[in-house]
Amino acid sequence: PLLTDASFSEDFAASVFLVLMLFGIVGRIFSGKLGDIIGALPTYILMSIGQTITVLGFPYIDFKIGLFIIAAAFGFTYSGVMSAILVCARMMVSAKLAGRAMALGSFFGWVGMGLGGYFGGLLFDIKGDYTWSFQFASLMGSVNLLILWQFHLRIKAKQEVIA
C-alpha cells in the first residue's frame, strides 16, 4: 500500500515487491555462507542491523531506482535474519532440543512479523502516513539488536571463563 498510496502503479509496486523477494533468496543463501564463516549469532546481528536500517528508508524514498535499491537491501537482510534465527537455534542447543528450539524460534519470528504488521497498520490509522509505522519497525529492530548484543556478550563472557 505504501507505493500505491504514493501514486505509483500497482505494476510498479509489484515489481518492487518482486525485487525484495528475489533478493530474499540471495540473502538466505548468503547468510548461510556468512554464518559458516563468522558464526550464526554474528550473522544474525549483522543481518538485523541491515534490516533495522533499511526499513527506515521506505517512506522517505520516492524515486523508482531508490525504491528498487532499498527493496533489494531489505529483502536481502530480512531473509538473512529469518534463516540466521534457525541456525542460531540449532547451533546453541543440544540435538535433543533442536527441533523444539527451531520451532519456537520460527513461531516467535512469525508472531513478531504479525504484530509488526498489526501495529504498523494501527500507527498508520492513527497518524495517517507510513512514517511512524516504519520508524516503529526500526525501533523494534533496535530492541532486537540490544537483546542479541546482550546474548553475544553473555556467550563471550562464558567462553572467556572456559578459556
Give the residues covered by each predicted segment.
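A late C-terminal transmembrane helix in Major Facilitator Superfamily
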Residues: 90-129, 137
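Helix-to-loop junctions at the C-terminal end of transmembrane segments
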Residues: 27-39, 124-125
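Residue-level signature of mid-helix packing/kink "hotspots" within the transmembrane helices
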Residues: 21-29, 110-114
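Intracellular juxtamembrane helix-capping segments at the cytosolic ends
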Residues: 80-93
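C-terminal ends and interior cores of transmembrane alpha-helices
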Residues: 50-62
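Helix-loop junctions at membrane interfaces in 12-TM secondary transporters
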Residues: 60-70
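Short amphipathic helix-loop junctions that connect adjacent transmembrane helices
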Residues: 1-11
